[in-house]
Amino acid sequence: MRILVFQTNIDSKHHIETVQTIFNDHSHILDWSIDIEDIDNVLRIEATHHLHEADVMHLVSQYGFNCEDLVG
């Protein structure tokens, strides 16, 4: 298992609902959360080793949101 951590501009419950389906239905995402009370709107993903940071950034950007790797 891998832990991936990102800074996003997903800053409301409505925005979370927008991406919820893609995260819940993704076969390599085991669990995820977005902290909209954090200044960085942190997206934390528990994933299999098959999911990479670039995959998540691409997925999120398809929905019009910004997503940057926080751990680097």
Label every model-predicted segment:
Residues 34-35, 71:
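Short loop/turn and capping residues at structural boundaries
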Residues 39-44:
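Surface-exposed aromatic
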Residues 36-38, 49:
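A generic beta-sheet turn/junction motif
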Residues 1, 38, 60-62:
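Short connector loops at helix/strand junctions that flank enzyme active sites
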Residues 1-11:
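Short glycine-/aliphatic-rich beta-strand segments at the starts of folded cytosolic domains
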Residues 9-27:
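Short amphipathic alpha-helix segments
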Residues 7, 20, 46-72:
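C-terminal structural segments of small proteins and small subunits
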Residues 28-34:
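A short linear hydrophobic-aromatic micro-motif
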